[in-house]
Amino acid sequence: MNKKAKSKAAVLLAALGVFALMLAATAWARQAASASFTGKWAVQTNVGSTTRETDYFLTQNGTALSGAILNGYRMTNISEGTVNGSQATWVVVMGTGDQQRRIAYTATMDGDELTITQSGGGGFGGRGAGRGGPMVAKRVSSDGTPVGPFDSLPRITPPALHNVSDGGMARTPPMGWNSWNHFKALVDDATVRGVADSIASNGMKDAGYVFINIDDTWEAGRDANGNIQANSKFPDMKALADYVHSKGLKLGLYSSPGPKTCAGYEGSYNHEAQDAKTWASWGIDYVKYDWCSASVMFKQGDEHAVYQIMGDALRASGRPIVFSLCQYGQEDVQTWGPSVGGNLWRTTGDIQDNWNSMSHIGFDLQVPLTSYAGVGHWNDPDMMEVGNGGMTNDEYKTHFSLWAILAAPLIAGNDVRNLSDDTKSILLNKDVIAVDQDPMGAEGTRVAKNGDTEVWAKPLARGAYAIGLFNRGASATDISVKWSDLKINGKPKVRDLWAHKDLGKVADGYSAQVPSHGVAMIRVEP
């Protein structure tokens, strides 16, 4: 081979070497990128034809890991993130104070798949994942920068304030049933029909329970014209409403003024009038409207105007629809709830099926609110937990009695298809229900407190009173009330509302031994 040929060969070999190095470098870079946890990882779950996505935005820096989790509209930062080879761990802290929960995550990476498990209760992902089951996330981007869920949506300017009619509805506190406390995302058409059948036949309808309310997770997306669609759990919402109506009952739904509901389903943002007309066409009688992702789109002080948008839409829908405001008592809702057409408004955060939650909401948090309720507009301390199993029978009697004295909506939250005798005796206590449904529409107030004992009284029509003697303590105790403290004269007639027994005319006052966490409840008539 001559020198010229050798030179060409050397150049070619050098070029091939450089090319090989470039290929190796590219492969190494790809391998390095795939070996990094940095990126956006998505977990998709399907519930009733609705696809929900949870996004994990992760950034790896050596053995440190940072980022955030986007579930529906909630962006939650991760902490204590570490990487050890193909495995990473991190922690998410949810809630505050005594409601705080630490959720620990472990993730194993295999190329562009991430298998995630979690422990600690609650958390993101499907039902199994929330109890520590695995989720498989796919890498959809190598950029781990968190992106807000609604950055591309137009912003609505809150309207000027004006008064909206209450529609002449809810002249007494609404009574019925709601799916969330017991069924959560597991509610479907068959469940609702079964509940309607039971309420129509087990005495609840006759006692006044008429609303069958479907809470979150019924929603799909929107059609080409922007109309809200129900998901496959509810194949024909109008047919379901017709069925419920055929039982002499009414059907309610749930939505949010934000783009997403609390569970991450389609909200009514920028579709308020359209949704109200759709619901009316289906035959809906009640709408619970939950703030949720509206917190991302509006300032906290905008709540009054934002709820007014849906109040106007419901009143213009052509159908009487009860309007239930659910924004957890923020922004002094009791002062403006009636002016947006609200028939009831939540006064607190969510109730839990335990004594501490129920008693704190019912006794402590309602005291400053009692003057704001009245005919057509009611304080709502949340749905009832009676029959769900987290409290004793005495505690459930206290729960029901207190809600009645508060003139609260009596919305059952248990599986009414299977009522125990104890639960039935509480929910169907017509003496106590009559206190709640009294046409005067006054909310009861706390008239005495002595340590763990409290006396509450509710004015009733024709000069009568309902009086509850409550024992929040750990042991039975005697509790008394004097008629003079309530400006009751003479010897009024007294009826024991749990014993269903007339006690005749009683002078001076009334005393009873009340069990721990229990109640004695009487009706006093002049």
Where are these regions (language model features)?
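Bacterial N-terminal signal peptides
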Residues: L13-A24
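Carbohydrate-binding surface patches
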Residues: W403-L406, I411-G413, K449-I488
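Glycan-recognition surfaces
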Residues: Q274, P320-D415, D436
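Structural recognition of the beta-strand scaffold that forms the well-ordered cores
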Residues: P173-S179, G208-I214, K250-S255, D285-D290, ...
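C-terminal beta-strand-rich structural cap/linker in extracellular carbohydrate-active enzymes
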Residues: K505-P526
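Central antiparallel beta-sheet cores of small beta-barrel/beta-sandwich binding domains
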Residues: R30-K138
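Aromatic-lined carbohydrate-binding/catalytic grooves of carbohydrate-active enzymes
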Residues: N181-F183, T191-K299
